[in-house]
Amino acid sequence: MSEAKPLHLVLGDEELLVERAVADVLRSARQRAGTADVPVSRMRAGDVGAYELAELLSPSLFAEERIVVLGAAAEAGKDAAAVIESAAADLPAGTVLVVVHSGGGRAKSLANQLRSMGAQVHPCARITKVSERADFIRSEFASLRVKVDDETVTALLDAVGSDVRELASACSQLVADTGGAVDAAAVRRYHSGKAEVRGFDIADKAVAGDVAGAAEALRWAMMRGEPLVVLADALAEAVHTIGRVGPQSGDPYRLAAQLGMPPWRVQKAQKQARRWSRDTVATAMRLVAELNANVKGAVADADYALESAVRQVAELVADRGR
């Protein structure tokens, strides 16, 4: 255990990544100790005092090695932060201290202090961008020894949404269910009940000018009771993406970096935008803005409002590019 890094800073507030980082530190420390029976103490960082922390970090008669995990360190008060800094500067041999810190909060400087002390940093920043979620999906599949293409990543994002924990679970389940043969068709097959799949399918048909196809897909989704707000949001996202990408030209990878989108999203929008003009995009944006209010209660018949908006958006480009 003496070779293990004694001080660890789990930095960020993406819960799944934080849990994994702490678990990795514990697993590594136990492996180095050669036993799973290493005492682990957990405590909120803001609740520690000098005496309590010294006691937690001190080897006992029964075990020379021990691990202390201090959570929510960003919210620790000034006194608690000082106690943690002091303890981290002089850890007893055989002790591992793990400090979980969001990176902000009133004890923001504590993270910088621990970093300057040589703490091993485990980045766990919240995953907020679509491109970051796409990278997370690829990483999850790679850890399961499965390689997926962009279409598969897109399908999974559309099917599962933005929750990182659900995305991780979906990746694991897909690999188990398909024996590793994961593609876009498999994603749609296993997640066919998700509203987002139908929402984006309807939106894609609408912005492609497929009036009949969009209307039919919408009726089917509504018959199954899909939330109107989700379907409306998918249409709005498709229109706004075309509005952002349409005026741009050039390499989709360069544009992706500029616009904060994944390259596959830019490439898809570039193809869709060929049907659209500045005026039709402006009209579509007005339609989806009105729809957003309508499906949230601005009109009595939200079903009709959604059907009308989908049809009107599709009709804007129904005769272009054919």
From Swiss-Prot:
Give the keywords, sorted.
DNA replication, DNA-directed DNA polymerase, Nucleotidyltransferase, Transferase
One record GO biological process: DNA-templated DNA replication
A cellular component term (GO) from this record? Answer: DNA polymerase III complex
Q: Name one Pfam family in it.
A: DNA_pol3_delta_C
Q: Which GO terms describe its molecular function?
A: DNA binding; DNA-directed DNA polymerase activity
Question: What EC number(s) is this enzyme filed under?
Answer: 2.7.7.7
Q: Self-association or partners: how does it assemble? A: Pol III contains a core (composed of alpha, epsilon and theta chains) that associates with a tau subunit. This core dimerizes and associates with the clamp-loading complex (or gamma) complex (composed of gamma/tau, delta, delta', psi and chi subunits) which binds Pol III cores each with a beta sliding clamp dimer. Interacts with beta sliding clamp (dnaN).
Described by its record, this protein's role is as follows: DNA polymerase III is a complex, multichain enzyme responsible for most of the replicative synthesis in bacteria. Pol III also exhibits 3'-5' exonuclease activity. The delta subunit interacts with the gamma/tau subunit to load the beta sliding clamp (dnaN) onto the DNA.
User: What family, per the record?
Assistant: Belongs to the DNA polymerase HolA subunit family.
Name listed for the protein in its UniProt record: Probable DNA polymerase III subunit delta
Q: State the species of origin.
A: Mycobacterium tuberculosis (strain ATCC 25618 / H37Rv)
Instruction: Give the gene that encodes this protein.
Output: holA
